[in-house]
A protein has these predicted regions:
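Short, solvent-exposed aromatic-acidic interface loops
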Residues: 284-295
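Short catalytic/ligand-binding loop motif for oxyanion handling, primarily in non-cytosolic enzymes
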Residues: 15-17, 68-71, 101-105, 165-167, ...
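N-terminal active-site segment of His-dependent metallophosphoesterases
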Residues: 1-72, 172
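Beta-strand-turn-beta hairpins that frame and shape the catalytic cleft
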Residues: 1-7, 16-19, 143-158, 188, ...
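His/acidic metal-ligating clusters that form di-metal
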Residues: 53-59, 91, 155-157, 166-256, ...
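Extended active-site neighborhood of metal-dependent phosphoesterases/phosphodiesterases
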Residues: 72, 77-180, 251, 272, ...
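Active-site glycine-centered loops adjacent to acidic/histidine catalytic or metal-binding residues
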Residues: 11, 64-65, 97-98, 198, ...
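Non-catalytic terminal accessory segments
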Residues: 1, 294-442
């Protein structure tokens, strides 16, 4: 691949400052939201200003979920920021995704959630024409997928798997045929190609393979199509996670999926990627950092992490709540136990041996820490750590349940080892970092 460098950021979820973000309805919503809404405009502006100051890198790529929920005012505000960034000399390429058009455009005022003007999928082309579409050498009207030659001999295949006219995360047969046609054309023109897609193609962590909305549908077929037709790198988002994963097709061809976190929520990273004349690709993660708000002495990363951790915990507790009769009673007891118990308490109830250093830790704190660590990348709780050993013993205790579940998870002839998937989700066995990595491309 010819030398190229660019900034990669995704899931900006821009929310226009002119829209309301206050009151009880907003506060209740934020209890389960992993990323910031009120702060989003300042975060985007701050990061864009920093990127604008880099005079050596002139390409910026943003793979979808540009706004909170397609609010018309949010699109206007975000596009204004894009134009300011373009004036600094940057070439900007975007794709849109489900949060950029839907039926859930709201603001929050006077303790209420109020509907505001949204955006249709058909409007997105004209709104973002100057940020990729106008430079397209091939364009798929149904999905707004496109191909652009971002520098001499290097083309970007922008796959929109989140269009209005198909199930979310779908690269259907028609679009696959279009993709193959574009890759064959690039090869005949002597160009190398990398791809972008909002949804991860390769599941970011093993357990996400079981979650339909966590990766593209029929992901192995899509990954093989790309790898076997010359695409070695795809840049993704959607899951708000820092991850880098490799997939090899049956023909032995590799695809590297670089998934980047939400810009406005923990882990709050963006990336700078360079490919040199020897086809060495370097991936660097950059902290969002200070964005000009008074955080009352709280460190910026802690500010992001606290919101994320609390939201994860609240979602789990909310999932356990509700129900009627015996089921409701059991769920209520489980929720109460999780809120109050330490890890040591749980270990005694289940007769599980744990490291004494974990015993006094609140169970809610451990859940938040593990969840946050998964999304930050590099999943530190590998074999040999107290956390890994505790989870392993917990899963062993419930092995009879897992064995009953596993056959139901089998799909397309692929059997699942649920215990292994869960343990490899909290502890990485990759030979490279999810944050900063280096690969030699073909």
């Amino acid at each position: 691949m010819n030398p190229v460098g660019f900034y990669l950021l995704t899931d900006t979820h821009y929310f226009a400052p002119c829209l309301g973000a206050e009151g009880k309805a907003f506060e209740n919503y934020m209890k389960k939201e992993q990323y910031f809404i009120k702060e989003s405009a300042s975060i985007v502006e701050s990061v864009f200003n920093r990127i604008a100051d880099d005079k050596e890198t002139d390409i910026v790529i943003i793979p979808g979920d540009l706004t909170k929920n397609g609010e018309k005012e949010s699109h206007k505000g975000f596009i204004n920021e894009l134009y300011k960034l373009r004036e600094s000399g940057k070439k900007i390429y975007v794709i849109t995704a489900g949060h950029d058009y839907n039926e859930w455009s709201y603001e929050y005022r006077n303790d209420e959630r109020l509907e505001v003007e949204g955006t249709s999928f058909d409007e997105l082309y004209d709104l973002y024409r100057d940020f990729g579409y106008a430079d397209a050498i091939a364009f798929d009207k149904l999905t707004h997928s496109y191909v652009a030659e971002i520098t001499g001999g290097v083309r970007m295949l922008a796959i929109n798997c989140d269009a209005w006219n198909q199930p979310k995360g779908t690269v259907d047969e028609r679009l696959r045929a279009w993709i193959k046609e574009q890759l064959e054309k690039a090869k005949s023109d002597g160009c190398s190609v990398f791809a972008i897609c909002h949804y991860p193609v390769i599941p970011s962590v093993p357990v996400f393979d079981l979650v339909g909305d966590a990766r593209v549908n029929e992901w192995r077929r899509v990954a093989s199509l790309l790898a076997d037709n010359g695409v070695e790198v795809i840049l993704t988002g959607h899951m708000h996670i820092q991850s880098i994963n490799e997939f090899y097709s049956e023909n032995g061809n590799r695809l590297i999926d670089i998934c980047t976190s939400c810009l406005v929520g923990s882990p709050a990273k963006y990336r700078k990627i360079t490919i040199d004349e020897k086809s060495v690709m370097k991936v660097e993660s950059i902290d969002v950092g200070d964005f000009g708000w008074n955080l009352n002495g709280v460190e910026v990363q802690d500010y992001f992490d606290e919101q994320f951790g609390q939201a994860i915990l609240n979602k789990i507790l909310n999932a356990l709540s509700g129900g009627k009769g015996a089921v409701g009673f059991i769920r209520k007891c489980a929720t109460k136990f999780i809120r109050k118990a330490t890890v040591g308490t749980l270990s005694r109830v289940l007769f599980i041996r744990i490291d004494k250093n974990l015993a006094k830790k609140k169970l809610t704190a451990l859940i938040s820490e593990i969840g946050l660590a998964i999304f930050k990348g590099d999943r530190p709780y590998a074999d040999g750590t107290p956390e890994y050993d505790a989870v392993s013993r917990l899963l062993r205790r419930f092995s009879f349940v897992i064995k009953k579940i596993e056959p139901k998870l089998e799909k397309d002839g692929v059997k699942r080892n649920l215990k292994e998937m869960l343990l490899n989700t909290i502890g990485s066995n990759n030979g490279f970092s999810d944050a900063n990595a280096e690969f030699v491309l073909k």
